[in-house]
Amino acid sequence: EGGPDGPAYSFRGLDDVGFYKRSGTTGDAYWDVTGCGNTVDATNVGALRLILDSLRYWVTEFHVDGFRFDLASALARNGHDIDMAGAFLTTIGQDPVLRYVKLIAEPWDASMDGYLVGSFPPPWVEWNDTYRDAVRDFWRGRTSPREMASRLAGSSDLYADDGRSPYASVNFVTAHDGFTLRDLV
């Protein structure tokens, strides 16, 4: 959106105060844990409805069978705190249409407390950056065979505590952020 005085490109034109999280004592500045200049307030009823209606539309009209949520921890925020039982995660997990599609979280945001690998509730699955880092280090001779085996077997140290299976881990080596595979090896 270009900041509070910039042009309106997205939600700002609909409900600027309601759709974006605010910071400061007067609430006149955007609060940003995404690195994009603002953070959608998924606890706002209107914003949550827009998100859910949009997702349902893609599922029912175009038969999309899953979604990946970039910086998904930002959507789990209630104020500045993270609430894994909050409005967005609870509602999407109980939705009669959306609970049956694949829900993939990039389980972090751009803040120090937003790293939530292994914390998203079912039916969510998560990008596993611990796997990513272990594979990259293994190629460089920096990861033990035991660590690599743990990652290949589903990272139970991250997902088994809450009863989730290895399927909760989405293993990847490179993605849209960062280096290409060629740059890494």
Predicted feature locations:
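Conserved alpha/beta catalytic core and glycan-binding cleft of carbohydrate-active enzymes
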Residues: H63, M84-V185
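Substrate-binding/active-site clefts of carbohydrate-active enzymes
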Residues: E1-V64, R68-Q94, G114, L158
